[in-house]
């Protein structure tokens, strides 16, 4: 009988050749960067998004680069659509999935006392419930691959307070704990799970927010590296965690934040 993780350790350390991946929300931003990073390392990737036009534009870009990427439309807040997506993935990859990256996430910036029940339910469903459900649905496929990887796209909001993000932060904190639980519960199935927590990253979703000079300067002032991150600085970590080189890393919460979460008080 093979030892746990043996099949992964026997593969080339810095290649994802022969592996398959599902990345949700891959038509733009961090998700798109993750799709490209995994595909450039040799993985066959399936991704989804709600906007079919944007998805097709991205697909044309990937095809022009010779990347092995397929797409489908899916609203991950819908349980039925999540189940349909996983049926598609199972069919595409012959019942085996090497990598799961639930990337879709939304939030609302307002005081806790002003948040509505509808906002709470939608954010929980989109961020946390979908991640939990995708993990459940993917488990048999990840197990069948012989060496499965789950990378949850969390946030520093799940590690420290960001202010006026109580619902969003709660979902991300729960995702970090979910990764730890899955890492322990599914270790015997040769499935690893980790969570990645970005700080402010230059993406279409942060463009307007960071376009405010005062906001950007404030963000940079509390970041030791004194700059906002780039999408490929997050996607490279996600890809690394999926590589055979990272076969002994599981259950970890890793911040990609230019030092923000460890920045204490400095005397003048």
UniProtKB/Swiss-Prot annotation:
Keyword Oxidoreductase assigned: yes
Under Pfam families, the record lists: adh_short_C2
Q: Which InterPro entries match?
A: NAD(P)-bd_dom_sf (IPR036291), Sc_DH/Rdtase_CS (IPR020904), SDR_fam (IPR002347), TR (IPR045000)
Keywords annotated in UniProt: NADP, Oxidoreductase
Entry keyword annotation includes NADP: yes
| Cellular component GO terms held in the UniProt record | cytosol; peroxisome
Which molecular function term from Gene Ontology is one that the record holds?
A: oxidoreductase activity
Instruction: Enumerate the residues binding substrate.
Output: 155
Q: Which residues are named in the active-site annotation?
A: 168 (proton acceptor)
- Listed binding positions for NADP(+) are 22-46
Disulfide bridge positions per record: none
The EC number(s) this enzyme carries: 1.1.1.-
Per the record, the similarity remark reads: Belongs to the short-chain dehydrogenases/reductases (SDR) family. SDR65C subfamily.
**Record's protein name:** Tropinone reductase homolog At2g29370
């Amino acid at each position: 009988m093979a030892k746990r993780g043996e099949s992964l350790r026997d593969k080339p350390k810095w290649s994802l050749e022969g592996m398959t991946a599902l990345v949700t929300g891959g038509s733009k931003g961090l998700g798109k960067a993750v799709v490209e990073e995994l595909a450039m390392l040799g993985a066959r990737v399936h991704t989804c998004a709600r906007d079919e036009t944007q998805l097709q534009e991205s697909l044309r870009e990937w095809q022009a680069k010779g990347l092995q990427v397929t797409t489908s439309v899916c609203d991950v807040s819908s349980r039925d659509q999540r189940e349909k997506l996983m049926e598609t993935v199972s069919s595409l990859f012959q019942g085996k999935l090497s990598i799961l990256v639930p990337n879709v996430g939304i939030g609302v910036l307002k005081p806790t006392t002003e948040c509505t029940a509808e906002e709470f339910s939608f954010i929980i469903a989109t961020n946390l419930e979908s991640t939990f459900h995708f993990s459940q649905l993917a488990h048999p496929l990840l197990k069948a691959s012989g060496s499965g990887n789950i990378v949850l796209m969390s946030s520093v909001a799940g590690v420290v307070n960001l202010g006026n993000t109580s619902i969003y932060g709660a979902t991300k904190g729960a995702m970090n704990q979910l990764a730890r639980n899955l890492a322990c519960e599914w270790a015997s199935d040769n499935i690893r799970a980790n969570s990645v927590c970005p700080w402010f990253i230059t993406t279409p979703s942060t463009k307007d927010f960071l376009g405010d000079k005062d906001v950007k300067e404030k963000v940079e002032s509390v970041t030791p590296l004194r700059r906002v991150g780039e999408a490929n600085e997050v996607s490279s970590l996600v890809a690394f965690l999926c590589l055979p080189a990272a076969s002994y890393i599981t259950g970890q919460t890793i911040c990609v934040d230019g030092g923000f979460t460890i920045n204490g008080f400095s005397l003048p």
